[in-house]
Design a protein with these regions (language model features):
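Bacterial N-terminal signal peptides
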Residues: 12-24
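His/Asp/Glu-rich, glycine-adjacent segments
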Residues: 111-228, 315
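A long, amphipathic alpha-helix that forms part
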Residues: 39, 52, 191-203, 213, ...
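Bacterial N-terminal signal peptides that target proteins for export
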Residues: 2-14
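Active-site nucleophile/metal-coordination loop of metallo-enzymes that catalyze phosphate/sulfate
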Residues: 33-54, 67-157, 173-174
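Active-site neighborhoods of enzymes that stabilize oxyanions during catalysis
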Residues: 288-395, 399-410
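Metal-dependent active-site segment of extracytoplasmic phospho-/sulfohydrolases and closely related
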Residues: 59, 77, 240-279
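Loop/turn elements at helix/coil->beta-strand transitions in domains of secreted/extracellular proteins
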Residues: 53-57, 84-88, 157-163, 207-213, ...
């Protein structure tokens, strides 16, 4: 049968169908961005003579960049960074719970969340009768919520200037210091403007130039939540930030300064299973303060009662009295953790309560984290680093992120306080073997 030419209408319909199919494969529409506002400058004095002799560390976080994204998605700049230095091909272990604020702060203090004060993104403190929420600027900028000595405060206390283009805790005065240079969090600041600011800091006179710098990108966490870890949008976001790392690395190389570039993530991502698991369907939580899945009983009798109601309630979680939480979680020594504690057995979104009557009950996001990385390997984070102080072509087995703190402090020539981490874990990646006398 002879083929007949397509009509204009048919061609138009085919064009529309093709356009829609292509659009379905594209990442979500990027949000509007704007230039960076003026940097906040704290007068911590000039770099000491000793600090001016030290090398530089630029610590970058790619939020939610799961340990296997680089190889799965072909993140060529990150993989090249790993080949030029060191990386963790099987991932880095976040601290429990594998949320953003607890783990960013664990990285820069070397303290598990039970010791660093940030036991979750949002939690309640019974002694203060107050709540910490990452969306509350008055809490985020209040240094009394935070424990430990973050790397920027450690540097400032030893005469070395620091700068933070975002990092949880960097807007607060902690251990007596704020970074010499920092910005208030605003995720709409243009991605390239962030890199330009980092490079501008490195062009300052030696007396004012920060030797420790942080940089943060919220991607691909957002896409992982909205679309899931296997989505095309998540892949596109991962490759986008990989491109930014390539641009940053080229800019750092052009400074000809001795800079160690360290790229990490805070946690991974997994596909959310089923719908919500709502605890008040299994237990009477009357009289409890609750924040997400965290439960704060006002009396021992209430805590024991709710524990007994929950301990055999569902296969989707395990209930513990706080004192009985397995030691490997490092999550039993801070009252902010609540009591009893609920630990998910899989990728289940757990909450204490649903919305009030009459309000829509939205399903959980497509992707989630916060789970135990020892039970859920999808929670593992990423680690790449290269620079003049780091051995090239080295790979490391999975390690806990608290071990980064003494390692970065060593790169900067700083004396670090005792923490939950150890320089010994990553000493084999250092050209001087972690020997203080060699610095």
């Amino acid at each position: 049968m002879q083929n007949r030419p397509l009509s204009r209408m048919a061609l138009r319909l085919l064009s529309i169908a093709f356009a829609l199919a292509v659009a379905s494969l594209q990442p979500a529409r990027p949000q509007a961005t704007h230039p960076a506002p003026p940097v906040i400058h704290v007068d911590n004095g000039p770099n000491s003579a000793a600090a001016q002799k030290q090398h530089y560390v630029v610590l970058v976080s790619l939020d939610g960049f799961r340990w296997d994204y680089a190889k799965r998605f072909g993140a060529r700049h990150l993989l090249a960074l790993g080949r030029a230095g060191v990386w963790a091909p099987e991932g880095m272990l976040p601290s429990y719970p594998s949320f953003t604020f607890p783990n960013h702060y664990a990285i820069v203090t070397g303290l598990y969340p039970e010791h660093n004060g940030l036991v979750a993104n949002n939690f309640y403190d019974e002694t203060r009768n107050a709540r910490y929420a990452i969306s509350d600027p008055s809490a985020v900028t209040d240094g009394s919520w935070y424990s430990g000595v973050p790397l920027w405060s450690l540097a400032e206390s030893q005469g070395m200037r620091s700068a933070c283009f975002f990092w949880p805790g960097s807007e607060a005065k902690i251990a007596g210091y704020r970074p010499t240079y920092y910005l208030q969090f605003d995720n709409k600041i243009d991605d390239n403007a962030r890199i330009e600011q980092v490079l501008a800091w490195l062009k300052l006179p030696e007396t004012d130039r920060p030797h420790f710098i942080t940089l943060y990108y919220a991607e691909p966490d957002h896409e992982g939540h909205e679309f899931g870890p296997d989505a095309a949008q998540t892949r596109a976001a991962a490759l986008k930030v990989d491109g930014l790392i390539g641009k940053l690395k080229a800019g750092l190389d052009a400074t000809h300064l001795p800079i160690d570039l360290v790229v990490v993530s805070d946690h991974g991502m997994t596909k959310t299973e089923d719908g919500w698991v709502t605890l008040d369907q299994f237990a009477d939580l009357a009289g409890f303060e609750t924040v997400g899945p965290l439960l704060y009983g006002k009396s021992e009798a209430d805590r024991a009662r709710v524990y007994n109601q929950l301990k055999h309630a569902s296969e989707k979680f395990v209930a513990y009295r706080r004192k009985d939480v397995p030691p490997g979680l490092h999550y039993s020594q801070n009252p902010r953790e609540g009591d009893p504690l609920i630990v998910a057995t899989g990728a289940y979104a757990i909450r204490a309560h649903g919305p009030p009557a009459g309000q829509d009950d939205r399903p959980p996001s497509a992707g989630m984290h916060g789970l135990d990385p020892r039970q859920m390997p999808e929670m593992k984070a990423s680690f790449f680093a290269a620079g003049p102080d780091i051995i090239a072509g080295k790979s490391v087995a999975p390690f806990e992120n608290v071990n980064l703190y003494p390692w970065v402090a060593h790169l900067l020539g700083l004396q670090s306080p005792k923490s939950d981490g150890s320089i010994d874990v990553l000493a084999g990646t250092l050209r001087d073997g972690g020997n203080e006398a060699a610095k």
